[in-house]
């Protein structure tokens, strides 16, 4: 099967029963906890690479997005903007976490494509490698 579901997890109480259920449904599981018993994203990428998987779609909330960016496993970002404003002091952001104090510490992106899909706008960006400054110079 070209498309298969894989679930990564860190050890948790009562996980064995859930894992059994997933296996009976044909879902593959990968256990790769870090020292805080959270999923070690770098270890997960190595594991998936060893299985011949060279790209993934990471869909999640701001905390997962922050963890993935900090782990250095993100090469491309796709953001969708809908013609709606929500606002609010406690509003969720695409990247949660502790943030950065200075603009120079921010993750830099380079636009690779912008298009309209229905009423939404999709923005694709390459994540810049700060070690290779020229990889993300914006063309004028």
Provide a role label for each language-model segment.
Residues 1-140:
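Enzymes that bind and transform nitrogen-containing heteroaromatic metabolites
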């Amino acid at each position: 099967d070209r498309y298969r579901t894989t679930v990564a997890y860190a050890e948790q109480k009562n996980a064995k029963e859930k894992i059994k259920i997933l296996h009976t449904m044909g879902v593959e599981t990968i256990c790769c906890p870090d020292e805080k018993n959270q999923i070690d994203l770098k270890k997960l990428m190595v594991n998936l690479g060893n299985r011949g998987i060279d790209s993934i779609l990471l869909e999640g909330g701001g905390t997962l997005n922050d963890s993935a960016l900090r782990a250095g496993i993100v090469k491309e970002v796709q953001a969708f903007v809908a013609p709606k404003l929500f606002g609010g002091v406690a509003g969720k952001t695409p990247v949660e976490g502790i943030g950065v104090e200075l603009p120079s510490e921010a993750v830099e992106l380079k636009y690779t494509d912008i298009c309209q899909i229905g009423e939404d706008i999709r923005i694709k960006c390459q994540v810049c490698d700060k070690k290779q400054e020229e990889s993300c110079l914006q063309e004028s």
